[in-house]
């Protein structure tokens, strides 16, 4: 681990009550979690490990970048020697593993990369954490591992039936993580969350993409019919969910992190058009919609029960109307937080295949 790859602000490992490793910390959700951890737990050292892929931005961490209990290390979870050394040097107590390739559209054309990063990288990380004797390992998965459903609500015991390469890679990684609990009683916890939205999300995902397209006077590109429905959870709420799992989650358990708020993709587009373009008629709203060919597979719904995490004291609080207005305003000012953000606005990924 080179001196150039890290920010030396912390004291020796023993000077903090806990040392928490957050992988993918320059990404969307993890950066929100890091900011909360750094500010709410001043006696915890928060170590951010990120390789700074295209969707990451250290601007997400500016509120805490100079804090004494925060450290950034640039590195790759797929580098087993580096990861082992990191655990030895940093004396990590807790891991929150967010680092992943997450864009479903991209997974269809770069499936091998998703397998490599999401499955192999997770295996490298959980094995290193096990060998280091970490006291809790939280693996961040997705509701998409359940596959789609029109009416059946999934709970944590529902079978995994993923339908796209991204979801398949996350499901496979879950199996590796869970095996360390089954084999060694290594204290792992798995979370599966609904779609999360809010500031700092790279604009390849549906909500920031639609917002950014409209703010650049371009139409919302809808895959297929747009009748697919998604549950949307605001970033501040999901942060509270992860802090709840961190403090109250039981080893070996899985927790759904969901919301009852559900909306079709076409309705989402229309609401954003009315909010941003202030359209006055249905025809005027429709003029800002462009229907394009669908994904190779596009699940209709991911209905999910979240009573298990509710029993730990967490429920979403931020109303859609409040969350979406904050999000729209953030992108109005911060779209260029990523140097390649314009690429994300194309209907389909334009990056070359991984292999």
Swiss-Prot record:
Classification via CDD domains: dTDP_GD_SDR_e
- Keywords recorded for this protein, A-Z: Lyase, NAD
Query: Where does the record place the catalytic residues?
Result: 143-144, 166
Q: Which cofactor does it need?
A: NAD(+)
A Pfam family of this chain: GDP_Man_Dehyd
Q: Biological process GO annotation list?
A: nucleotide-sugar metabolic process
Does the UniProt entry include the keyword Transport?
no
GO function terms (MF aspect): dTDP-glucose 4,6-dehydratase activity
The name this protein goes by in its record: dTDP-D-glucose 4,6-dehydratase
UniProt organism field:
Mus musculus
